[in-house]
Amino acid sequence: MQWKGAAMARIATFDDWIDYFRQWQKDIGYDPALLGDYNFETKLGELHTGEIEFGDFKGQSKWERIGQIPNQSIRDALMNLIVYQGDTEFASVEQQKNLLDKAPTEYDRQALIRVNSEEMRHGWQMCYLLVNYFGDSGKLEAKKLLERRAFRGDRLLGSFNAPVNNWLDFFTYTEFVDRDGKYQLTMLSHSSFAPLAQSVTAMLKEEFFHMFTGHTGLTRILKAGKIPVPIVQKYFNKWLSTAYDLFGTDHSSSAHWAYVWGLKGRFDEHEAQLPAAKDKLNDLARDHYIAECGKLIDQLNALVPPGEPKLYAPDLKFNRSIGEHVGKRYSVTGELLSEDDYDKHVRDVLPTAEDEKLLNEITKGKDWVAQAQVS
């Protein structure tokens, strides 16, 4: 279901899209006044190199225009990458906007506003590419990016339809889901399509604040010691299991061809010495991510009091919505369970209505999160 007038809207220029963006803000209930003098603009960073870095076209000049791309299959795959990235950005704002009036401190409220403004700008950047480079089909996709809704459950990726109901949700989301974003943007920063590579290089610089917000937020929660560690663990189980899905299916053919065509590289493309294992690109990126998250969790565990259970990342097979483990009844520690045992296990290890009720009680005060260290 679209908002009033949406069906009549037509995107002919980027200015038309900007008008539609303003309507989107209004429709989701996001007051632009909250953003102050934030300037929505397109930003282009530096290319790693002017030459295509990998794949069948390695060594050729990066493509500056769609007409330079050799065939329609490559153009379609490129547009699809941009659409999916843009969809995550607008979805994040829709998921998080309800927390503005629940911020524990003014510092946190301003941090959330900054995160939201940068997510909007990243979506803006992707739509700039769609409208200005991809003709009528790109304009249609840019329009659709503002018509899907996280709270209707029709965003393109499952993580971006999940509810973000409280600030523990938010801090865990920005720690782990935004960290996936770092990986996706890094892989796209090597793209053979120069305008995309330049766009995501600029976006990456802003993404680091989102991850910083998540990690320091979780640090402050553990320092305060008011929210039980087992409840924090449940939110890790919720968001990490869905973040694993964001890397795509195992043995992905689309990732294979994106690499062959130079559209999306490896996370460590700039330092990789060995030829790419093109059938395992998603798996290898996910492995890097899991290793990084493990180190972050180790840092957080230093704040867990003696006698309390240590935090951990759920097993890769738990609660998966895509890939070879989808629909299988694995526990958070990787054991295969019976149907009855699994149903009980899920109730024990993912956030429940009772957990949210307890969190709401705890977070009515201001002492559930330690004071932010502002330099």
Please describe what each predicted stretch is.
Residues 1-110, 132-164, 247-375:
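Terminal targeting/low-complexity segments that flank the catalytic cores of oxidoreductases
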Residues 3-6, 76-85, 104-122, 170, ...:
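Alpha-helical scaffold segments that form or flank carboxylate-/histidine-based iron centers
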Residues 82, 112, 171, 200, ...:
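Hydrophobic packing residues in well-ordered alpha-helices of helical domains and bundles
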Residues 88-96, 122, 177-184, 210-214:
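Amphipathic, well-ordered alpha-helical segments in soluble domains
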Residues 99-103, 188-189, 221:
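Secondary-structure edge/capping motif, primarily at the C-terminal ends of alpha-helices
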Residues 111-132, 202-220, 238-245:
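Alpha-helical scaffold segments in carbohydrate-active enzymes
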Residues 135-212, 231-263:
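Active-site-proximal alpha-helical scaffolds that flank and shape metal-associated catalytic sites
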Residues 193-194, 222-228:
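Glycine-rich cofactor-pocket loops
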